[in-house]
Design a protein with these regions (language model features):
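Flavin-dependent oxidoreductase catalytic cores
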Residues: 1-378, 382, 386-390, 398, ...
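Local beta-strand N-terminus motif with an aromatic residue
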Residues: 51, 157, 240, 304, ...
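Flanking helices and flexible, charged tails adjoining ferredoxin-like Fe-S electron-transfer domains
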Residues: 197, 361-370, 393, 405-406, ...
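Hydrophobic, well-ordered secondary-structure elements that form the walls
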Residues: 243, 274, 298, 310, ...
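Short beta-alpha connecting loops at secondary-structure transitions
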Residues: 254-260, 305, 411-417, 533-537, ...
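N-terminal glycine-rich dinucleotide-binding loop that anchors FAD/FMN and/or NAD(P) in oxidoreductases
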Residues: 329, 413-439, 478-481, 540-566
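Rossmann-like dinucleotide/flavin-binding elements
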Residues: 369-402, 440-452, 463-478, 483-540, ...
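SH3/SH3-like beta-barrel fold
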Residues: 573-577
């Protein structure tokens, strides 16, 4: 990658080590509403990896704004900002304090007070009506931004970023969807933003003043459009030092950081149009930019001056350094599975391919690494590949035995159904090759062979995976000879018998929807059956809930919701309504079961370290986390070949 992306850049009198930005996002790493030591370790790791600018998790500038339980509050967070800035400073990374107010798109669950909004417009998901802000509240917001900027200044940050993007009060003032006022703040919708910028600039004169601006709400009937955004970007650009162009609003918050179903670099043209009117103010491209080559192209073509690669740096904190050295970074597959954590359960930010994300050590390890030895990994799915890679990276001699003819396990086998995951297993395989892992394909291990390896002092990690589920029907009788053919989702790519198909999805994840759409695209008559009230119930967390329903609708897939499978019939399968108990026959010739598999126990040898689906069939995230944890356990302990105790004291199912 050319030095323009990974080389230094000047910004408002400051120098950043690269043009790559790590943008603000929900982490749930806080101690209540305060930045924690985990925040410090999280941001320090990206700075160490070469990030040019780090924008901290957006802090609410008013105590009445708490959009999620662990949302940082600017008031009283000076020590946290200071610790983050101090940790990033040795690497030259610029730290900007993210400041914002969620307005009517916040939550009253924790504050128990009315939400604030420009007008009485309900948030679409919660239907909660805000109070229409009076001049007193508007003045409080302006003062709140100034006071927060002063705190960031005193903490030693390099500047602030004001949120005028998705889920922000200032954007709500800009938009005709949410601003129906008839006073000066309605006639001049950017007035409050200008007042905030002026107050912040007056308070933090020496700092960088950046803004994150929504330039398309995807609601042209009344919302912000690219054309209207050009007007206020032209107006605001002379007042600020940096502009990050984003999209998404009241009815399209999912469009801000969408998953892999949306094309990468989707904001390219939008950013180009804003840069045309921004004058000399640098502009940042945001929007599923995960490939350094794409980022470089955006710079070369004049789309932007810097590029935000937030999810890509969650996946690989060393993205900048790897790119500068000509090495491929660990890919971000844009699954949104564990990095999008705006969730009332407060999951901590992480990454399916990098389980250390969000769990960076706050202190140097006090343990002494074990002397390098021999490791045998049985099974080359995601868990086995990650275990082999981690051990080999630490200098251990690693062998990897895989009974099939290819690496990647079920991900590789079902590649056409989950193509977004293939780059991750390909990268793991390439890293194993680079690190000298000795791979033996078409090699099955026996219990006796595993036992002999363990007795010789070799650490053995078993990642033998899972098998397809049995017949999903509770009917104990086998399917009638002339009835529907049952098959697993993984077998779909090997060919599906002729006729109508039922896709049974008891999980609500991405696989069931992908299978149904794939079969419908092949011209099959498909009915999607789920026990849930909606299609893909678990996809809300990734931002794909509405998208999944839309794809099924466009594909012509029928839906049978709130239903369990009740038994076989000669012409189809019986489905029972979960609420009424009513049974309905769905005629079909094939049932594709998208249930989790059954753990394999062929190598269930006492003392063997089992990881991945052979412990419990879960997702790629848990498989890779198991692989990393098991390998780290090996690296940190010195085995005693004369003892068997150490071989039985750890299992990934009880690891913390």
């Amino acid at each position: 990658v050319d030095a323009a992306l990974t080389g230094p850049v000047r910004l408002a009198g400051c120098s950043a080590p690269s043009r790559i930005v790590f943008g603000p996002h929900v982490t749930n790493l806080g101690d209540g509403r305060r930045f924690s030591r985990r925040h410090v370790a999280y941001y320090e790791r990206r700075a160490r990896g070469g990030a040019g600018i780090v924008v901290t998790e957006t802090a609410s500038i008013h105590p009445g704004d708490q959009p999620y339980e662990r949302a940082p509050l600017a008031e009283g967070n000076g020590a946290g900002w200071a610790a983050i800035a101090g940790a990033c400073r040795p690497y030259g990374t610029l730290v900007l304090a993210g400041l914002g107010h969620a307005g009517l798109e916040g939550s009253s669950a924790w504050t128990r007070s009315a939400l604030w909004g420009p007008s009485r417009v309900a948030e679409p998901a919660t239907r909660e009506l805000p109070m229409e802000m009076e001049l007193t509240e508007i003045a409080e917001v302006v003062e709140g931004f100034a006071r927060a900027a002063a705190g960031a200044r005193d903490a030693g940050t390099d500047g602030v970023e004001i949120d005028i993007g998705v889920r922000s009060l200032l954007r709500q003032f800009h938009s005709g969807l949410t601003n129906h006022r008839t006073d000066d703040y309605g006639r001049d919708r950017t007035r409050v933003t200008r007042e905030v910028i002026t107050a912040v600039r007056h308070t933090f004169r020496s700092g960088i003043l950046a803004v994150r601006v929504c330039c398309d709400e995807l609601a042209p009937w009344a919302g912000i459009t690219p054309e209207s955004a050009r007007g206020f970007v032209r107006e605001l650009a002379p007042l600020v030092d940096l502009i990050t162009v984003v999209r998404g609003g009241l009815y399209s918050s999912h469009a801000y950081r969408p998953d892999f179903h949306v094309a990468r670099n989707f904001n390219t043209e939008l950013c180009r149009r804003m840069r045309e009117v921004a004058g000399a103010t640098p502009v940042v491209l945001q929007g599923s930019v995960v490939d350094p080559a794409d980022a470089q192209r955006a710079l070369d073509e004049g789309v932007a001056d810097l590029v935000e690669m937030t999810r890509a740096q969650i996946a690989d904190p060393d993205l900048v350094r790897r790119s500068a050295a000509g090495r491929a970074p660990r890919p971000c597959v844009l699954c949104n599975q564990t990095c999008q954590v705006l969730d009332p359960r407060n999951p901590v930010v992480s990454c399916i391919g990098n389980p250390e994300a969000g769990a960076e050590p706050c202190e140097p390890s006090a343990g002494k690494p074990a002397a390098p030895g021999e490791v045998l990994v049985v099974g080359a799915g995601p868990a086995g590949l990650e275990a082999a890679r981690t051990a080999a990276e630490s200098g251990w001699s690693v062998r990897l035995a895989e009974r099939s003819s290819r690496l990647g396990g079920e991900v590789a086998r079902a590649g056409a159904l989950v193509p977004h995951l293939l780059p991750l297993v390909d990268w793991l395989g390439a890293e194993c090759a680079r690190l000298g892992v000795r791979v033996a394909l078409d090699t099955s291990m026996t219990r006796g062979e595993v036992t002999r390896e363990m007795r010789s002092g070799t650490w053995v990690l078993v990642a033998e995976g899972s098998d397809p589920s049995p017949d999903p029907s509770p009917d104990p009788s086998p399917p009638p000879a002339d009835g529907p053919h049952w098959m697993s989702a993984a077998a779909v790519l090997d060919g599906v018998p002729d006729g109508a198909v039922v896709t049974w999805d008891p999980v609500g994840g991405p696989l069931g929807v992908a299978v149904a759409c794939r079969l419908a695209a092949d011209g099959r008559d498909v009915t999607y059956v789920t026990p849930d009230d909606v299609v893909g119930s678990r996809l809300a967390a990734t931002g794909d809930l509405s998208g999944a329903g839309e794809r099924l609708q466009r594909a012509g897939v029928r839906r049978q919701l709130r239903s369990d499978l009740a038994g076989w019939d000669g012409t189809g399968i019986r489905c029972r309504d979960r609420y009424t108990g009513e049974t309905r026959l769905v005629r079909c010739d094939v049932v594709v079961d998208c249930s989790p598999g059954r753990s394999r126990h062929e190598l269930d040898v006492p003392g063997a370290n089992r990881i991945g689906d052979c412990v419990a069939p879960r997702t790629v995230a848990e498989a890779i986390r198991d692989g990393r944890a098991a390998a780290r356990h090996v690296l940190e302990r010195e085995p005693d070949p004369t003892s068997t105790i150490w071989r039985t004291t750890w299992d990934c199912s009880t690891a913390r």
